[in-house]
Amino acid sequence: MNGALDIRLCNVNDIEVLSALAIKAYKEVYLYLWNDDGSWYTNRAFSHAQFQKEFDDSNAEFFMVLFNESPIGFMKLNIDLPLPGFEYFDAMELERIYLLKSASGMGFGRKAVEFCFKYAQSKHKEMIWLKSMDSSDALYFYSRMGFEEVGEYRLDYEIMKPEFRGMKILMKRLT
């Protein structure tokens, strides 16, 4: 990795960039999940209005991942969200982490997740958790980052191919 990686907190002025980045990154990786071209989900999850709604939630924080000052990804953290079944831990959820395909394999994902660990620790969190598609190559990445599987979840989106609706719930203890 030659160049400067930067991760910064987003604000509402970043919504347009976040929306475009989310749609592009999602479609580069997850189109196989859908019976359509993924438009139903991306229109629902990554619209300007949806990002505005999520920015209005004081528990949510977005971070832009930049390489040489160009956006290559983003993360969404839910600062105070216990993992069901593990409520005795002060936990943070890594709800979304998306990187452009062109940024894959360069260590940016590892740096972004390490940033999340440090950020969670700065907020005195004992655990960070996430959900990942059970058909995703990301599961191996998360296990290398120290996450362990603690449960399963199933999405109920009718337009999603049934064989790809499974998710794994993963957690990492920080203390």
Describe each PLM feature range.
Residues 64, 70-79, 93, 98:
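Conserved beta-strand in the GNAT
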Residues 120-131:
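Conserved GNAT acetyl-CoA-binding A-motif
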Residues 46-63, 93:
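A short helix-loop-beta-strand connector motif used in the catalytic cores of GNAT acetyltransferases and
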Residues 26-53:
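Conserved GNAT-fold acetyl-CoA-binding loop/helix
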Residues 129-131, 143, 148-165:
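Conserved catalytic-core motifs of GNAT/GCN5-like acyltransferases
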Residues 105-118, 144:
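Conserved acetyl-CoA-binding loop-helix of GNAT-fold acetyltransferases
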Residues 97-104, 133:
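A short, internal acetyl-CoA/4′-phosphopantetheine-binding micro-motif in the GNAT/acyltransferase core
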Residues 1-16, 173-175:
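Conserved N-terminal entry element of GNAT/NAT acetyltransferase domains
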